[in-house]
C-alpha cells in the first residue's frame, strides 16, 4: 500500500514537473533569433517570380481568359501553392524554387513562335480597349495590376504564415524574433501596415484632384469610423484568447494588446499627421523624422530598457511593447502612404515637365520607384552597417528605426519588381481610352485569386485568424508530420481562397 502511494506521488510530481501543451506551444514561438536578410529576400522574391510566370502565361497564351475551373486551379497553385512551398518544403532552398519557377516562365515567353519577331510582339489590347468611342473617361486615379498583385501576394503569405508557424515544418528562423534580428514573419507584420498605408493615400489624392481640403475635425471623425471596427475586433480577440486559455506570446505586443489594436489606432494618428504636411510636405519625410525621433528617444532615455525588461505592474507596463512599437508602425504606414502618392495617380509627368507618351509616363513611374527603393535601401544600410553606419540592430519588438527602414526598403523593392513585370509583359493594356476599357484591361492583367484577396483583405485576414484558432484548438500541431501538415495548410488556404474568390465573383466587398 505504501509502495502504491509512493508511485502515485511520483507520477503526480512528474506530471506537475512536465510542461503543459500550452506551455510547449508558447516555448515553440519564444526566444527565437530569426534568419538572414538575404534569405528572407529570396523567399519574398518568390512572389514576383510567380507573377512573372503567371503574366507570361496570360500575355502569351491568354491562359486565364476565360476564367474556367482549370484556370482557377492553376491560378491557385501558382499564387498560393508556390508561396506555401517557399515557407515549408522549399524553405531551406528558396533560391532553387525561384529557379524552378523562372525556367517555365522563360519557356512560356519564348516558345510562342519560332519567328523571332513574333516573340517580341506585344500583347494586343482587348476589344474594348481598342475602342475610343466608349463613354466615360477614366478618372484621375487608377488601380494598377502590379499594385493588386503586390498586395494580394502579401496577404496570401500573411495568411499562410499565421497558421504554418504553429507546425514544426515551418522553420523557426522564419517565426517572429524575440527581440533582436530579422525574420519573415517580422517582415510580414510591417508589410501589412505598409500596404495599408499605400491604399490610404487614395482619399488624399482624390481631395487634391478635386481641389478641396478636409478640416482636421472631419478627418478625425472619418478616421474613427475606420478605427472602431478594428478596435472591436481587437477586443473580441483579447476576450477569446483569455477565455479559451489560448497560447500567448506576451513579449510580442504585451498582455492585452494585439495587432488589431495597432491597426485600429493608426487612422486617427495619420489624420493628425496629415496636418503636419504643411511643415514637412512629404509623407516619406514625416516617416523618417518620426522614426529618427523615436530612435533617439530609445537610445538617450530609459525607454528601451523599460520596454525590454521593465516589470509588468500596470496597464502601460503590461502592454508596453504594443503601445511604444506603435510609433514605428505609424512611421511605416506614413512611408507606405508616400509610395501610394506615387503609384496611384493615373498619369505621372516625367521630370522634364512634358506630358509625354504612355511609355514615357510608365518609365517615369518605374524610375521613381527604383529611385525611392535605392534611397530606402541606402538608409537601411547606413543605419545597420557596423563599419560605415550607425551599427543598429533590427527589432520588431521595438519597431525601431532599423526595422522601419528594413520593412520600407524591402517592400519598395518588391513593388518595383511587380511593376517591372507589369511594364514588360502588359505595356499595351495601359492605352485604354475610357473607364470600361481600362477595367477590362485591368482584369486581363491581374490574377483573379490575388484580386480577390486584395478586394476583401481585412475580412479574409479575420477569417484566417478564426480558422487558425480553430485548427489549434482541434489539432496538436506540434505532433503533426510533414505530409499531414501540408494537407492541413493546403486545405486551409483552399478554404480561404474559395471564400475570397466567391465573394469577388458575386461582387461582394466587406468593409471593416
From Swiss-Prot:
EC number: 2.3.-.-
Region (Disordered): 118-140
Ranges annotated as spanning the membrane: 37-57, 70-90, 92-112, 154-170, 180-200, 253-273, 279-299, 323-343, 364-384, 401-421, 458-478, 483-503
Glycosylation site residues: 31, 507
Protein name: GPI-anchored wall transfer protein 1
Domain of life: Eukaryota
CC per GO annotation: endoplasmic reticulum membrane
Family of the protein in this entry: Belongs to the PIGW family.
UniProt entry tagged with the keyword tRNA-binding: no
InterPro entries given in the database record: PIGW/GWT1
This protein's encoding gene: GWT1
Pathway annotation: Glycolipid biosynthesis; glycosylphosphatidylinositol-anchor biosynthesis
Topology of the protein relative to the lipid bilayer: Multi-pass membrane protein
GO BP term (any one): protein localization to plasma membrane
The protein's role, per its UniProt record: Probable acetyltransferase, which acetylates the inositol ring of phosphatidylinositol during biosynthesis of GPI-anchor.
Lineage: Eukaryota, Fungi, Dikarya, Ascomycota, Pezizomycotina
EC class name: transferase
MF terms in GO: glucosaminyl-phosphatidylinositol O-acyltransferase activity
Keywords: Acyltransferase, Endoplasmic reticulum, Glycoprotein, GPI-anchor biosynthesis, Membrane, Transferase, Transmembrane, Transmembrane helix
Cellular compartments annotated: Endoplasmic reticulum membrane
